[in-house]
UniProtKB/Swiss-Prot annotation:
Annotated function: This enzyme is involved in nucleotide metabolism: it produces dUMP, the immediate precursor of thymidine nucleotides and it decreases the intracellular concentration of dUTP so that uracil cannot be incorporated into DNA.
EC number(s) per entry: 3.6.1.23
Domain of life (superkingdom): Bacteria
Matches recorded under InterPro entries: dUTPase, dUTPase-like, dUTPase-like_sf, dUTPase_trimeric
Pathway where it operates: Pyrimidine metabolism; dUMP biosynthesis; dUMP from dCTP (dUTP route): step 2/2
Positions of substrate binding: R72, S73, G74, N85, L89, I90, D91, M99
Protein name, UniProt field: Deoxyuridine 5'-triphosphate nucleotidohydrolase
Amino acid sequence: MNAVQVKILNPKIGTDANFPMPTRATDGSAGIDLRACIDEPITIKAGETKLIGTGMAIYIADPNYAGIILPRSGLGHKHGIVLGNLVGLIDADYQGELMVSVWNRSDTDFVLNPAERMAQYMVVPVVRPSFQVVEEFNELSARGAGGFGHSGRQ
């Protein structure tokens, strides 16, 4: 897969210098930046979550791929701005506007400005295994059923 369909829902995108077409920030960037498609700044209070539109829809079509929306590391580390659902999974057959659940996990209000890069979008391959119901696994792994800290912290 080399292309997905992008539907521009807000006429500012690609025509207003503040709302460029979605692109990667650098040649080495894995994802494209998703910008806040808002008309005026929005204050996200400490602990609050807001759903913010991107002004576009992306249709992948190929069920062997999915889109994921991830937080931007700088916003998360410096300002406590992450995704309310931690990771957004966008199915290949979804055709609606990409929305970003923006969560301010800090104790300080945050102002999100129009066209500000708030998240990133990646297309990833999807593996669809069949499931085989068994009474017991055919081999024991070294880990077994140990979980939630089973392997220690060091």
